């Protein structure tokens, strides 16, 4: 499962970002949820948070290092997920010793798999629960506190659908909706079916009722979740519902009839069960997004057979062809495993060939991770790490070039974005905001004070990179939404609002700039457009190099040097070049050799280094031009004055000194501009950080939202 095209998406296990505090000021016990792994775990974590809040706990304040209750929702797909869990548990051990009232709970797939090992490796853990009984968490915490003993409860079968539990959603504008739990496939690399169980499907009525409820709360986008969504309908939990192979296509069409639902996504389908009725439903239902994430895993039929993936490369490519025929602009992404046991160079070459033919918008690539308990762990031909790494790097290089070409083709196109929060890791530094296009691509656009996460904007793509797009041309349209209102509640920024002077022609200084940007009442102030332009120019200046304005001043240095040295007449028929070259009797008599040497130095430094500064855009060369011209020009003047041979009114090589002083003034001006620019950029970054903090709705700690699940955790 996946959404999003960032570079980090290739390796989703980055460790959770920790959020902080212990006891709430009111005395209510606080909690913190740290999530590892796939979207299914993210969905479950929202339910865990909802259960704790329903039981009277309060989410820990943003920035807190720990809380009264810390819950780890774990992943068992890759070995590094194990390592990160136990590393974080070890980090909490001293806190647990110093605060015995603190409780630690471990749930999810790893807890389901290693129920005894968790307490053996981390005996300070209070609760261990599995994937099938997340609704038991509040009871288990209370029981552990009362009995002063660890509680381990692992159910072997699903007790209730997580979607029926209370939820504390991470987003006001987007929501996960689980349509099934478990998986009926038996991929040899995957441990998930043994941990999540056989597939069980929710009834369409239950799913649609949840979607309508979410839309009534202001949600604009839902993602339908399942380990294999296009197997939906084969194993309904309600025995009264007949087996229905076409149920998923009908579910998509039914979502299209819900008023107010702007976008529908789903993840993940299995190629073996992908049918044309789903393609037709995607193409014919306006709010179903033109995006498809369909795991390939390998382009080699031999490896696919060893993986027990019941399709072959040509079938997979045929599905892609039919999707693109129905939706030419669909973004298709995939999962790929490198280094599966027995993979030969020929097998890997077949994968590269399929990647070239498929032209994926993005591919989430993973190095095979040997997991005990899976059939693949017992296969012969385990690939050396160095070989896997080398193949992985080649695959990533190929896919990045394809992704870049695909994104570059979008430059100049108009896109609709659902403005997101937390998507752009550098938004605060670049004074940008981020959003997702309908095809799932991540777009960073110029920040606008009126736009909130959850709003919809249209803009034009101006730049491209392999994992994101840039839209710096400004916003064409902006639609405020109830989800945006939820992210910017009334009065949330009252403390930062101050009275600003009325609009005028005066350019604001830093303090006035902050006043303008902080005050929501000024969103129509025409000064803001000019200020945003100033910020962009400031960023370029601070980043280094000589900007277009500075280049004009350096050109003026060249003009003055040339005028002073060659063109302007001095006295009578003696001109500048006569002074420098000594070609005229008057020039030779007027200026001795040392003066001419210094005059030449002034010319070389003024013209030569100023020209180099223009070509290379290096400020250091401009400073050399300044220093050399000033020294040479001043020395030439002193040489002339000391000999007292200069004709009356003849400035001679003193033009070098004049040019030097002009250069001094120009560079002082440029230095002041850079100082101003740094101030503006710093203020912009501070303001953006303040906005992000104000918009953050919760502090549940998610490892990688939105990040792809490892292919072994999906289909």
Swiss-Prot record:
The chain crosses the membrane at residues 552-572, 589-609, 621-641, 652-672. InterPro entries: Elp3/MiaA/NifB-like_rSAM (IPR006638), Methylthiotransferase (IPR005839), Methylthiotransferase_CS (IPR020612), Methylthiotransferase_N (IPR013848), Methylthiotransferase_N_sf (IPR038135), MiaB_methiolase (IPR006463), rSAM (IPR007197), rSAM_horseshoe (IPR023404). Residues 169-405 form the Radical SAM core domain. This is tRNA-2-methylthio-N(6)-dimethylallyladenosine synthase. [4Fe-4S] cluster 1 binds at residues 38, 75, 109. Residues 29-146 form the MTTase N-terminal domain. It comes from Mycobacterium avium (strain 104). Residues 517-715 are annotated as: Unknown. Its EC number is 2.8.4.3. It is found in: Cell membrane. One of its GO terms (molecular function) is metal ion binding. Monomer. In the N-terminal section; belongs to the methylthiotransferase family. MiaB subfamily. SMART domains: Elp3. SUPFAM superfamilies: Radical SAM enzymes. Catalyzes the methylthiolation of N6-(dimethylallyl)adenosine (i(6)A), leading to the formation of 2-methylthio-N6-(dimethylallyl)adenosine (ms(2)i(6)A) at position 37 in tRNAs that read codons beginning with uridine. [4Fe-4S] cluster 2 binds at residues 183, 187, 190. It catalyses: N(6)-dimethylallyladenosine(37) in tRNA + (sulfur carrier)-SH + AH2 + 2 S-adenosyl-L-methionine = 2-methylsulfanyl-N(6)-dimethylallyladenosine(37) in tRNA + (sulfur carrier)-H + 5'-deoxyadenosine + L-methionine + A + S-adenosyl-L-homocysteine + 2 H(+). It is a multi-pass membrane protein. Its cofactor is [4Fe-4S] cluster. Residues 408-475 form the TRAM domain. GO terms for cellular component: cytosol; plasma membrane. CDD domains: Radical_SAM (cd01335). Residues 1-516 are annotated as: (Dimethylallyl)adenosine tRNA methylthiotransferase MiaB. It comes from the Bacteria.
